[in-house]
Design a protein with these regions (language model features):
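Short, surface-exposed loop/strand segments
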Residues: 11-15, 30-37, 61
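Alpha-helical transmembrane signal-anchor/signal-peptide segments
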Residues: 26-47
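Acidic/glycine-enriched edge-of-secondary-structure segments
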Residues: 21-30, 75-83
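N-terminal hydrophobic targeting signals that begin at the initiator methionine
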Residues: 1-2
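Serine-dependent acyl-ester chemistry module
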Residues: 148
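Hydrophobic membrane-insertion alpha-helices, especially the h-region
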Residues: 6-24
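Membrane-embedded segments
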Residues: 54, 58-144
Length: 148
């Protein structure tokens, strides 16, 4: 019985150390910023949207699926994140079309003015929130800078 309690105590201690280390090493923007959360929240949504909005902060700051639904009855979802680059939007669209076939996709081309990532933090807001998939892998390859 003592041996069992000792093993149990060691396992609990390992779990606590792992949990605390994970909290310490987790990028602070993962919990503190709303930007990018629509990327991850999408996976918990019903996949029957009539309209999908894809793009950078111009999209999530200016389109409200709740207001659109209340005023028109049209279901929609915003798959936007800060400084979402054009190629990131492409891969998000490709991934979205695996889950559902919306009637309309509003694709923001504002990001065409950027030809490289602005900052790693914004890059990661989009990348880190996606589920692992072929699209995420391709997006990571396309988003890497020369130093990475």
């Amino acid at each position: 019985m003592k041996k069992f309690l000792k093993i149990l105590l060691i396992l609990i201690l390992i779990f606590i150390i792992f949990f605390l280390t994970n909290k310490l090493l987790m990028p602070k923007y993962m919990d503190s910023l709303v930007e990018g959360s629509m990327i991850s929240q999408y996976y918990d949504e019903d996949k029957n949207h009539e309209v999908i909005f894809i793009g950078d902060c111009e999209v999530y700051a200016n389109f409200s699926p709740m207001v659109i639904y209340e005023e028109t009855g049209i279901t929609s979802y915003v798959r936007g994140s800060s400084q979402q680059l054009l190629w990131q939007s492409y891969y998000i669209l490709e991934e979205t079309l695996k889950y559902e076939k919306p009637k309309v996709v509003v694709f923001n081309v504002n990001a065409m003015r950027y030809d490289k990532p602005v900052s790693e933090a914004y890059n990661r807001l989009t990348l880190d929130k996606m589920k692992w998939s072929k699209q995420k892998y391709e997006m990571i390859k396309a988003s890497m800078t020369e130093e990475e």
